Protein backbone atom coordinates (compact mmCIF):
# COMPACT_ATOMS: atom_id res chain seq x y z
CA UNK A 1 0.00 0.00 0.00
CA UNK A 2 1.37 3.41 -0.97
CA UNK A 3 1.44 6.27 1.52
CA UNK A 4 0.64 9.28 -0.65
CA UNK A 5 1.12 12.72 0.85
CA UNK A 6 0.94 16.35 -0.17
CA UNK A 7 3.08 19.41 0.46
CA UNK A 8 1.81 22.57 2.14
CA UNK A 9 3.37 24.38 -0.84
CA UNK A 10 0.20 23.43 -2.71
CA UNK A 11 -1.59 26.09 -0.64
CA UNK A 12 0.91 28.40 1.03
CA UNK A 13 4.46 29.68 0.64
CA UNK A 14 5.13 30.03 4.38
CA UNK A 15 3.09 27.84 6.70
CA UNK A 16 1.90 29.65 9.84
CA UNK A 17 -0.91 29.43 12.39
CA UNK A 18 -3.34 30.95 9.87
CA UNK A 19 -2.82 27.86 7.69
CA UNK A 20 -4.02 25.23 10.17
CA UNK A 21 -7.07 24.67 7.94
CA UNK A 22 -4.74 22.98 5.43
CA UNK A 23 -4.30 20.01 7.76
CA UNK A 24 -7.91 18.72 7.61
CA UNK A 25 -8.14 19.76 3.94
CA UNK A 26 -5.22 17.48 3.03
CA UNK A 27 -6.86 14.58 4.87
CA UNK A 28 -10.23 15.24 3.20
CA UNK A 29 -8.57 15.11 -0.23
CA UNK A 30 -7.30 11.60 0.45
CA UNK A 31 -3.71 12.22 1.54
CA UNK A 32 -2.19 10.28 4.42
CA UNK A 33 0.85 12.50 5.01
CA UNK A 34 1.26 16.28 5.15
CA UNK A 35 4.68 17.65 4.23
CA UNK A 36 5.10 20.94 6.10
CA UNK A 37 7.76 23.44 5.04
CA UNK A 38 9.63 25.12 7.91
CA UNK A 39 12.42 27.60 7.27
CA UNK A 40 12.26 29.38 10.67
CA UNK A 41 11.72 26.66 13.30
CA UNK A 42 12.04 29.14 16.14
CA UNK A 43 8.72 30.78 15.15
CA UNK A 44 6.83 27.68 13.96
CA UNK A 45 3.45 27.13 15.74
CA UNK A 46 4.44 23.68 16.96
CA UNK A 47 1.82 23.21 19.67
CA UNK A 48 -1.05 24.24 17.42
CA UNK A 49 0.08 22.00 14.56
CA UNK A 50 0.63 19.07 16.91
CA UNK A 51 -2.91 19.38 18.23
CA UNK A 52 -4.44 19.67 14.77
CA UNK A 53 -2.60 16.71 13.19
CA UNK A 54 -3.60 14.57 16.18
CA UNK A 55 -7.21 15.67 15.83
CA UNK A 56 -7.27 15.01 12.07
CA UNK A 57 -5.22 11.82 12.04
CA UNK A 58 -2.66 12.68 9.39
CA UNK A 59 1.07 11.94 9.49
CA UNK A 60 3.24 15.07 9.76
CA UNK A 61 6.58 15.32 7.99
CA UNK A 62 8.67 18.48 7.73
CA UNK A 63 11.05 19.81 5.11
CA UNK A 64 13.42 22.74 5.21
CA UNK A 65 16.06 24.56 3.25
CA UNK A 66 19.11 26.11 4.80
CA UNK A 67 19.68 29.71 3.70
CA UNK A 68 22.66 31.98 3.19
CA UNK A 69 22.34 32.88 6.88
CA UNK A 70 22.38 29.21 7.96
CA UNK A 71 24.62 27.75 5.26
CA UNK A 72 26.71 25.00 6.87
CA UNK A 73 29.25 25.10 4.02
CA UNK A 74 29.90 28.83 4.42
CA UNK A 75 33.53 29.85 5.04
CA UNK A 76 32.19 31.89 7.97
CA UNK A 77 32.18 29.74 11.13
CA UNK A 78 29.44 31.88 12.66
CA UNK A 79 27.12 31.12 9.74
CA UNK A 80 27.93 27.41 9.98
CA UNK A 81 27.16 27.51 13.70
CA UNK A 82 23.86 29.25 12.97
CA UNK A 83 22.99 26.44 10.57
CA UNK A 84 23.64 23.78 13.19
CA UNK A 85 21.58 25.71 15.72
CA UNK A 86 18.67 26.06 13.29
CA UNK A 87 18.72 22.37 12.39
CA UNK A 88 18.78 21.37 16.05
CA UNK A 89 15.76 23.58 16.67
CA UNK A 90 14.05 21.89 13.73
CA UNK A 91 14.81 18.54 15.35
CA UNK A 92 13.11 19.78 18.53
CA UNK A 93 10.04 20.82 16.54
CA UNK A 94 9.84 17.42 14.85
CA UNK A 95 10.20 15.54 18.11
CA UNK A 96 7.35 17.55 19.63
CA UNK A 97 5.17 17.08 16.54
CA UNK A 98 5.80 13.36 16.43
CA UNK A 99 7.24 13.66 12.94
CA UNK A 100 9.61 10.87 11.91
CA UNK A 101 11.25 12.57 8.90
CA UNK A 102 12.98 15.84 8.04
CA UNK A 103 13.47 16.37 4.32
CA UNK A 104 14.91 19.03 2.05
CA UNK A 105 18.19 20.82 1.55
CA UNK A 106 19.60 20.16 5.01
CA UNK A 107 23.27 20.04 4.03
CA UNK A 108 23.98 23.48 2.49
CA UNK A 109 22.29 26.78 1.75
CA UNK A 110 19.68 26.33 -0.96
CA UNK A 111 20.58 28.41 -4.00
CA UNK A 112 23.97 29.31 -2.50
CA UNK A 113 25.99 28.38 -5.58
CA UNK A 114 29.74 28.84 -5.44
CA UNK A 115 30.18 28.91 -9.21
CA UNK A 116 32.50 25.90 -9.08
CA UNK A 117 32.32 22.22 -8.11
CA UNK A 118 31.94 21.19 -4.49
CA UNK A 119 35.22 21.28 -2.59
CA UNK A 120 36.59 18.82 -0.05
CA UNK A 121 36.50 21.59 2.55
CA UNK A 122 32.79 22.19 1.91
CA UNK A 123 32.19 18.45 2.17
CA UNK A 124 34.01 18.30 5.50
CA UNK A 125 32.12 21.30 6.89
CA UNK A 126 28.76 19.83 5.91
CA UNK A 127 29.47 16.31 7.14
CA UNK A 128 30.75 17.66 10.46
CA UNK A 129 27.66 19.83 10.92
CA UNK A 130 25.26 17.05 9.95
CA UNK A 131 26.97 14.56 12.22
CA UNK A 132 26.44 16.90 15.19
CA UNK A 133 22.78 17.48 14.33
CA UNK A 134 22.10 13.82 13.57
CA UNK A 135 23.63 12.69 16.86
CA UNK A 136 21.52 15.31 18.65
CA UNK A 137 18.43 13.88 16.94
CA UNK A 138 19.43 10.30 17.70
CA UNK A 139 19.67 11.10 21.39
CA UNK A 140 16.08 12.37 21.34
CA UNK A 141 14.06 10.08 19.07
CA UNK A 142 14.02 7.80 16.03
CA UNK A 143 13.80 10.83 13.72
CA UNK A 144 15.42 10.44 10.29
CA UNK A 145 17.12 13.44 8.67
CA UNK A 146 17.23 13.21 4.89
CA UNK A 147 19.33 15.02 2.32
CA UNK A 148 17.52 15.98 -0.87
CA UNK A 149 19.46 15.70 -4.10
CA UNK A 150 18.52 18.78 -6.12
CA UNK A 151 19.39 19.95 -9.60
CA UNK A 152 22.59 21.77 -10.53
CA UNK A 153 20.81 25.12 -10.80
CA UNK A 154 19.82 25.01 -7.11
CA UNK A 155 22.93 23.53 -5.49
CA UNK A 156 26.44 22.49 -6.43
CA UNK A 157 26.69 20.20 -3.40
CA UNK A 158 24.42 17.13 -3.81
CA UNK A 159 22.84 16.44 -7.20
CA UNK A 160 22.80 12.64 -7.50
CA UNK A 161 21.94 9.65 -5.35
CA UNK A 162 25.45 8.22 -5.50
CA UNK A 163 26.95 11.28 -3.80
CA UNK A 164 24.09 11.45 -1.30
CA UNK A 165 24.63 7.85 -0.19
CA UNK A 166 28.35 8.50 0.21
CA UNK A 167 27.48 11.54 2.31
CA UNK A 168 25.14 9.53 4.56
CA UNK A 169 27.78 6.85 5.04
CA UNK A 170 30.40 9.41 5.96
CA UNK A 171 28.12 11.08 8.50
CA UNK A 172 27.87 7.60 9.94
CA UNK A 173 25.14 8.03 12.53
CA UNK A 174 22.64 5.71 10.85
CA UNK A 175 19.76 8.19 10.91
CA UNK A 176 20.73 10.26 7.85
CA UNK A 177 19.20 9.06 4.60
CA UNK A 178 18.46 10.21 1.05
CA UNK A 179 15.50 12.27 -0.13
CA UNK A 180 14.79 11.65 -3.83
CA UNK A 181 12.63 14.08 -5.81
CA UNK A 182 11.55 13.13 -9.33
CA UNK A 183 11.70 16.75 -10.54
CA UNK A 184 15.41 16.85 -9.77
CA UNK A 185 16.10 13.23 -10.69
CA UNK A 186 14.99 13.65 -14.28
CA UNK A 187 17.57 16.42 -14.66
CA UNK A 188 20.52 14.77 -12.95
CA UNK A 189 20.21 10.97 -12.84
CA UNK A 190 20.76 8.67 -15.81
CA UNK A 191 18.23 6.14 -14.51
CA UNK A 192 15.38 6.27 -12.00
CA UNK A 193 15.86 2.58 -11.26
CA UNK A 194 19.57 3.09 -10.84
CA UNK A 195 19.13 5.99 -8.41
CA UNK A 196 16.65 4.07 -6.27
CA UNK A 197 18.83 0.96 -6.25
CA UNK A 198 21.88 3.03 -5.34
CA UNK A 199 20.06 4.13 -2.20
CA UNK A 200 18.48 0.76 -1.50
CA UNK A 201 16.22 0.22 1.47
CA UNK A 202 19.01 1.15 3.88
CA UNK A 203 19.57 4.68 2.63
CA UNK A 204 16.30 5.69 0.95
CA UNK A 205 14.46 7.88 3.43
CA UNK A 206 11.93 10.07 1.65
CA UNK A 207 10.26 10.67 -1.73
CA UNK A 208 8.85 13.75 -3.48
CA UNK A 209 6.64 13.17 -6.51
CA UNK A 210 6.90 16.06 -8.96
CA UNK A 211 6.43 16.17 -12.70
CA UNK A 212 9.41 17.22 -14.83
CA UNK A 213 7.88 20.68 -15.41
CA UNK A 214 6.32 21.03 -11.92
CA UNK A 215 2.97 20.32 -13.54
CA UNK A 216 0.33 17.69 -12.78
CA UNK A 217 2.03 14.37 -11.92
CA UNK A 218 1.34 11.80 -14.59
CA UNK A 219 1.12 14.27 -17.49
CA UNK A 220 4.80 14.78 -18.29
CA UNK A 221 8.09 12.99 -18.84
CA UNK A 222 8.76 11.35 -15.47
CA UNK A 223 8.78 7.52 -15.89
CA UNK A 224 6.35 6.90 -13.06
CA UNK A 225 5.84 3.19 -13.60
CA UNK A 226 9.59 2.60 -13.62
CA UNK A 227 9.98 4.75 -10.51
CA UNK A 228 7.25 2.97 -8.57
CA UNK A 229 8.53 -0.44 -9.66
CA UNK A 230 12.01 0.44 -8.41
CA UNK A 231 10.64 1.72 -5.09
CA UNK A 232 8.65 -1.47 -4.64
CA UNK A 233 11.71 -3.49 -5.55
CA UNK A 234 13.84 -2.06 -2.73
CA UNK A 235 10.99 -2.28 -0.24
CA UNK A 236 10.39 1.43 0.26
CA UNK A 237 7.20 1.94 2.30
CA UNK A 238 7.58 5.55 3.44
CA UNK A 239 5.67 8.67 2.40
CA UNK A 240 5.50 9.64 -1.28
CA UNK A 241 4.58 13.31 -1.38
CA UNK A 242 3.20 15.39 -4.24
CA UNK A 243 5.03 18.72 -4.30
CA UNK A 244 4.23 21.68 -6.51
CA UNK A 245 3.17 25.28 -6.03
CA UNK A 246 0.01 27.33 -6.31
CA UNK A 247 0.12 29.44 -9.50
CA UNK A 248 -0.61 32.57 -7.46
CA UNK A 249 2.62 32.47 -5.46
CA UNK A 250 5.08 35.28 -6.08
CA UNK A 251 8.33 34.85 -4.17
CA UNK A 252 8.48 31.06 -4.30
CA UNK A 253 7.54 30.87 -7.96
CA UNK A 254 10.26 33.42 -8.72
CA UNK A 255 12.85 31.40 -6.82
CA UNK A 256 11.75 28.15 -8.48
CA UNK A 257 11.37 29.75 -11.95
CA UNK A 258 7.71 28.86 -12.43
CA UNK A 259 6.29 31.22 -15.04
CA UNK A 260 3.03 29.58 -16.12
CA UNK A 261 -0.02 27.82 -14.73
CA UNK A 262 -0.28 24.04 -14.89
CA UNK A 263 -3.70 23.85 -13.22
CA UNK A 264 -6.37 26.22 -11.98
CA UNK A 265 -4.92 25.95 -8.49
CA UNK A 266 -2.33 24.06 -6.52
CA UNK A 267 -5.10 21.99 -5.00
CA UNK A 268 -6.45 21.02 -8.42
CA UNK A 269 -2.95 19.95 -9.42
CA UNK A 270 -2.59 17.79 -6.32
CA UNK A 271 -6.01 16.15 -6.65
CA UNK A 272 -5.56 15.24 -10.31
CA UNK A 273 -1.98 14.18 -9.66
CA UNK A 274 -3.07 11.86 -6.85
CA UNK A 275 -5.66 10.27 -9.12
CA UNK A 276 -3.07 9.75 -11.86
CA UNK A 277 -0.43 8.33 -9.55
CA UNK A 278 -2.83 5.95 -7.82
CA UNK A 279 -3.82 4.57 -11.21
CA UNK A 280 -0.18 4.06 -12.18
CA UNK A 281 0.69 2.52 -8.81
CA UNK A 282 -2.17 0.05 -9.18
CA UNK A 283 -0.42 -1.39 -12.24
CA UNK A 284 2.86 -2.04 -10.41
Q: How should these model regions be labeled?
A:
Residues 1-12, 16-27, 47, 98-100, ...:
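Histidine-acidic metal/acid-base catalytic patches
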Residues 3, 59, 143-144:
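Residues at the starts of beta-strands that form the adenosine-phosphate
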Residues 32, 36-127, 237, 241-251, ...:
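Structural motif corresponding to the early beta-alpha repeats
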Residues 11, 68-70, 109-111, 151-152, ...:
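A short, flexible beta-alpha/helix-coil linker loop
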Residues 55, 78-177, 187, 260, ...:
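Active-site acidic/histidine proton-transfer and metal-coordination neighborhood
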Residues 13, 40, 71-74, 117, ...:
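Short N-terminal micro-motifs specific to bacterial/archaeal maturation
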